[in-house]
Amino acid sequence: MSTQKKLKVATTSLAGCFGCHMSFLDIDERLFTLLDHIEFDRSPLTDIKTCSPDCDIGIIEGGLCNAENVHVLREFRKNCKILIAMGACAINGGLPAQRNHLPLTTILEEVYHTSPGLTNGMIPNDPELPLPLDQVHPIHEVVKVDYFIPGCPPSGDAIWKVLTDLLAGREPELGHGLMHYD
């Protein structure tokens, strides 16, 4: 039995579709091999809601569309020695960033006041709701990101390659065949 310390890995999802986490599951049975070397900290895959302050690797999918996303990202970065941006939304804002060419007020007006079928529409003003940002931002605009796994979503093989390279003490390198957008 190995006495090597397992690395703590945390994952979270911000403004995205959760497709990157689904790709994480596409590692399939190799997850069992991975679990010999890592333990999950905060992750929707495990339903653990908090990140310990000594997490080795943090993986984030999704961009930043509201104040809560920014807060979660900063706390996550503070607790993780290595931070990986996973997927197009985390790396460049992805599909949510398509709203960036319109003012936020125009978008809110369309969604809550002028959309077909709305009667007596009003823009929510509830302190429990996170404040939307004027634009969607990729995570590297707010915190330092150590590695990027591109794709929409990235393949399970790409995620596997980055994690196994890091576990082996190597700089992750994704070959041409591992980077794609489905």
Walk through the language-model features, giving the residues of each.
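Iron-sulfur-associated redox domains of electron-transfer enzymes in respiratory
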Residues: 1-182
